[in-house]
Amino acid sequence: MPLFFITAGYFFSLKYLNDEATFVKKRVKGLYWPFVKWSVFFLIIHNWMFDIGILNERFGNETGGVTHPYTWHQIQQNLWHIFTAMGGYDQFLCGAFWFFRGLFVASILYLIIYKVVLHVLPEKRANAAPYLICLIMLLLCAWKTYEGLKIITLVQGGYRDLMGCFFFGCGFIFRQYAGQYRQFIGRHYAALWTTILFAVIVLLFSKYLTANMNWRSTFVQFLSLPIPALLGFLMTYNISLWLDRHEGRLKQFLVYTGNNTLNIFIFHIVAYKVVSLLKIWYYGLDIRQIGCHMVIHEYSQQDLFWILYTIAGVGLPLGCTWLSRKIKERVRGYKASSGSRPQ
């Protein structure tokens, strides 16, 4: 997830410091509205998922937590929560929806703090603003995780939002040096050996100091997050530069994937259920294990079903997106041809 925050910051423009309304409108249109629309959709079908067996009260997440059908009161409360706090979404079908809120809060928070810092700093020190913001966010997250504090006005306490703001700022800073970085990795095979080095470091962190943007992250997990997150971004950036120089089907696929990331993000958990059915058949498991979140945990450390989960999580949403657009084109073409016929 840090990769998405860093990338969003990479494309942040200082022009929005004097055009806040446009920036906020874009955030509402691109983050708040999709969150509300799809959270309400999954809220409506939540209880139906129990009727058809996709969800159940026997199997759930890896720690044993399960979900339950909603009462009428819970449905109403979740609806209010969705609109007013960007919470209340279905944890088992929309588990990654926290990202909508995280990026929404992080990006607007970054804009606000940037304006405040510019007001406080002397004009000749204005270039230090992005670094100061990242430092402030790191210190706040350190304080928060060390003392177990919560921002009570933010769902899940605000850790993801603050760390998201830090990574957003890192992306903006990197943009200022992107040209110099590309020159550096363009010499003496630096792109190759730095990519390998970054990959090894990320792998070591994932094995010995596992960390992510879990909202309950400890102080140690907080300390072990920035390095692999930033190096993972640089590794991905190196690879993307290489891919961008080579035309072909792979590049076309990745461009199409990037243009339809939202659909993948919304439906990847639902797509996993197809692979879960296959795994249930293969191992002869209880059919109710399809309710496991996000994937079936049994044998997950031994088998290679993660490959199929990855393919399905990306491929099925993309395939459905492509098919739906083709159908819409056919329908529009049919209506246009019907309308042009003489009566």
Task: Please give the residue ranges for each predicted region.
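Alpha-helical transmembrane segments and their immediate juxtamembrane cytosolic regions
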Residues: 1-343
